[in-house]
Amino acid sequence: MSIYRRYISKSVIFFSVFFVIFFLFIESSVGFKYIFNFTNRIFIGLKAEEISGNWRDFTLKNIKYDVFGISITANSLHIVLDTRSLFKMSTIFKKIETKNVILSLKKNTASNFSQNSLPSKISKNIFFIKYPIILKKIHADKILFTSPKVRVSFLDVLSGIKLVRNNIIFSPTYINTIHVSSAKFNFEKKNILNKSTIIKNFNKIKKIYSFSYFSSNQTKKNFPLNIYLKSLKCNKTQFIDYEYKNLLQVELQANIENNILQINKMKVDSSFLKMNSYGKVIFNNDYSISCVMNSKTVIPSLYNKSINFQLKANFNVDHQLIFKLISKDLYNMKINGLVFLNFSDYPFFIKLQSRNLSCVIKKNYIFKLKSFDGVLKGYINNYFFSLKNIFTLQDLPPIFIDIQGRGDLNNIFLKKINFFPIKQKKFYKKVIHPEDYIKYNQYILKLIGQINITGKSDRHTHYVHIPKIDLYANIMKKKLSILGALYYKNFNFIETPGINLLLGKNKLYLRGSLGKKYNIYSSIYANNLDYFFPKLQGRMQAKVNFLGNNKFPIISSKILARDLNWNNIYFKNIKVLTGININNTFSGKMLIYANKIHFYKFYINTLHIQTYSNNHKQNFSFLLKSNRLHINLIINGAFNNKTGHWHGFFKKINIRTFWGQVTAKKNNFIHYYDSHNSITNFYQKSIKKRNCFSSFLYNVKMSFFNLFNRSFISFESKLSINAKLKLILGKMISDGAIFLKGNNTKLEKKINKKIFIQNIDFFKISMNLIKNDFKSKWIIKKNKKLSNNKNIFGYLNIIDIYNKKNIKGEFIFYKFPFSFINFFTTNFKEVSGKFQSKIKLFGTLYQPKVLADVHFKNIFIRSNNILKYITLFFPYFLGKVDNIKINQEIMMNKGNILFTLKPFFKNNSADIEWNIAFNSKKISVLIFPKIKVKFSSKLNLHYLFSKYDLIGYIKFSLFYFQINEKNFIF
């Protein structure tokens, strides 16, 4: 035994001496240098010419490092470590200082990185940091980013970073100056290049960073980190490649969480533009990107004209960039655009509309555009533009102008310019009689009916069955009936055995299914066309069928009409046949036949139009017969898939008028050349449009079952609807009411082979819109026979809903069963008890405040996760009992909870602040068999800025436990 102890003592002495020697060794500059070089060669691969200092405070000089095709160099790197933090939960670096950092992006790095660098699925655990790492102060005198196309310099950068779990939190960041310049061209005043020369050189550059190429090689990846930027302020931004060096001041507050970039504040200040913006960018799992930005812009050069606008953009999986810009301050100016990013010539279409756009030329001189319409479409090097507007100058008559032209990267050609003054017309006010006002002051919509609905959800299978739809509506004094049934399954399948829409004597019938494959059959029988279209008379029958799948639809239709008459245009008979089959090869045909047509004073005896086309050949025939005019044309054509050229010829030309006859020889050729498009691209676009349509249908389907996605649940209810809306001419909807009633609602959920059932005998929801105020009342009765037990009563009002949006509401839960919590969690095996609560809502719709007072009695919970919830009150024990799976029970005889929630604003930043006060005198927890712990507790949990404060006590029979935890993070 003594020998054993002797060996142990010698081993302890040996390791103690070794530790002291190793500690003294790394404390010295020489020792730290050897240790750093040894570990660096094995793990990091960083090269440093000079190393000084020790492990607590060291400096690296002339650093070189290559990662992911990016070359990083720096003159020096100085790091200071807080040694006391090594004995705490967080590791703190007091200071990190760099000098002259250069990041060089090599050629083809973007494509190589997208293909090889990241795995298809990234687990969050790879980037999970259990214990926080804090970089307290980071200072860089200069950071230079270079690429084959651009150079960006950041001067005097000051920031801080906190790494915890999957979160990266940036402290308020300051950048003194940002310089942006081109890496290819030097636009100095001494050497100004010709514009055409620049464009030619630009066209010769290889498109290394083509956005379409980069996005097309991407697989679905989720970014596993959440990034929070409290604030970023840039004192000056300078673009040094241009003749006028514009200076900008930029301030930014943003964060990235769950693939959503939330921009809380973006402020740009310059001599020519001042802008405040906020919004968000969503990176979807299918690699599409959605963006919504709201901005307020002030233009000093236009006498501080203030403009509020909203930008909505979407980059979808078909590489189409769709955007919409709306500004109400510019009198409803709208800009809609579509850009195809998967083609080298970038086809696009942009449309601008504005009414009464005004611009201040001088302080008391205004330039107005009464009606402004613009179109820009084509390709980046071959586009067409059209501008039509009416503009006025002060004291001058309005002038109409029409400009059309085309252009490319080098030139702009004007094809047509027309302008002429418009004669002024005097407008007289029309007297509106009271009966006319009453006509427009009626309810535009009245809806009443009943719906039976049942549903079921079992993990990944969901059903909603509506066996009875019985709705009756009155739209602008026109009656509408909706009768039928609907079946919905698993987010991607909708089927109806039949739905009838009755509009007066007109009937629309729908039958079929919509899913991965769809079969939709519809028919229209309209004998009363003027029911919705005044002055339109006649009869019409139609059948339209959609068959196939998402990519290759088959569409067929047959439309027959008789005695159509509208505004001096009369058709005796019309027949339209259509057949389209987009399979591996496109084919389509259409036939239009009409006879005895009266077009004002012109009479047409017969009109016959027929077309047929596929991927390679096309045929078009046109026949018109009348007393004064006879036209017969037959054109055959073919597309060349390789060149994109179309070649056609007239098989027949015969035109006869009262002046004489015009004929031509056969095989008169016509050609169309377009180097930017081919018929193959056209059909690919058609297929992509079908994909977009299918994707739209899928996104429209509601995610109603997401809340119950983990376990089996079903519901059944009978719902009645009564609604009406009133519209005053020239104003918004002024009055309206919606009443919903439900009877015998049954909820059923299966957890761990055990079934939970809850019945709601009756619920009633009424919503009223009276002028600018929205008011609603809610009544939910679990047991209709018990007047005061197991009920929910309340109201929610929004005052001045179009402007101030102030909210006021109150909900009362009276002796409601606590077992309802089983429908929101799967962790509890058994729950019982009752609670009653009063919840008040106030504030505004955008800044709501909540006050909830909850009283509970005889609460019993059985679960194997109770210890996990209890440890939430002790942050240092988090995660220590996660693997304990035993039967645990908690009983609370009586207690109350007070919950408050309100928005918090500080230094122009917004956050949510909430507080929970818990108080119970009799609590017992059964942890192990025959081990019961009894205690009382009074706790207060406060949340603000992602941090928690917990203050209170837990009182046991033998001892008293005081809690005072502040600024901790779950």
Swiss-Prot record:
Residues annotated as transmembrane: 12-32
GO BP terms, alphabetized: protein secretion
Entry membrane topology: Single-pass membrane protein
Presence of the UniProt keyword Cytoplasm in the record: no
Nucleotide-binding is among the record's keywords: no
Compartments reported by the entry: Membrane
Cellular component per GO, a single term: TAM protein secretion complex
Keywords: Membrane, Transmembrane, Transmembrane helix
PANTHER family: TRANSLOCATION AND ASSEMBLY MODULE SUBUNIT TAMB (PTHR36985:SF1)
Similarity field: To E.coli YtfN.
Name the UniProt record assigns to this protein: Uncharacterized protein BU087
Organism: Buchnera aphidicola subsp. Acyrthosiphon pisum (strain APS) (Acyrthosiphon pisum symbiotic bacterium)
